[in-house]
Amino acid sequence: MNFKNWSLRRLALTVGDHLRRRGVETVLTGGACVSIHSRNRFASFDLDFVLMAAEDRRPGRLALEELGFRKDGRHFRHPDTPYLVEFLLPPVSIGSAPVLHPAEIRSGRRLLKLLSPTDCVKDRLAAYFFWNDRLSLAQALGVAARNAVDFRDIRRWAKSEGMDEKFIHFKKLAADARKTGPEGGAP
């Protein structure tokens, strides 16, 4: 298959749907979700698919090979695209909390399961909370500025992770960003 000049979103939809049609259930996570939910404000060149069952690694590899991807270390590469595909082992979780209800994007008959905007914000905040990653904080703010997110759910999750103070900082920055618009200042 020729993937030249395909967007990350289009490729993610195609790969995710192809895996699903081959019986390999996945959820797209990580930077690809940030890119999709921030409308490409933040670029990512990897598609991290969490397998719903660890035994799906081999069928997943075979499905990717059908599309022309080849295994290269832990990633899969295709000669027509700069995007890499990686399988992560289950469960789909953010910090210690499982992701129970992934979002779905449909395009025609294609279907992609991915982190919801709320879970995508939590995923980025986890890197900020635990490793002080400022880029991840900026990504969380970018996703929150462009999507309806459940701040109560994020607050509950942050509290369960012992990160009340950092959540308060995030919430203040998010409120400031709403005042200045989604392209407002960096954190």
Residue ranges and their predicted role:
Residues 1-187:
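Compositionally biased terminal segments of proteins
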